[in-house]
Amino acid sequence: MILEIAEIRIAPGQQAAFDEAIQRGLTTVVSQAKGFRGWKVNKGIESPERYVLHIFWDTLEDHTVGFRGGPLFAQWRAIVGPFFAAPPVVEHFT
């Protein structure tokens, strides 16, 4: 199993709307992807515009090729992308 960790910074004052958007995007879009196994979102206390998203995949390729290279990625970014203050920083772990 592969763990994707994405550090996300959103525009100030958008937390409530982003909370709804990320939940909707994960449950309606990302969860449809091949190899998707689950997710967890952590919100910053000292930095309320900072989120850490954990997504579990069967393989690295399920995320980097299947999801990111397919139509679901565009749907996901259409939902959450407008909130980003900067591009997310994404890394993978075993």
Spell out what each predicted region is.
Residues 9-22:
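Short, surface-exposed ligand-recognition loops at beta-strand->loop->(often short) alpha-helix junctions
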Residues 15-16, 27-30, 41-44, 77:
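Intrinsically disordered, low-complexity segments enriched in polar/charged residues with Gly/Pro
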Residues 2-9, 39-68, 93:
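Short, well-ordered beta-strand segments in beta-rich or mixed alpha/beta enzyme
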Residues 24-36, 56-90:
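An amphipathic, aromatic/His-enriched active-site/gating alpha helix that lines ligand/cofactor pockets
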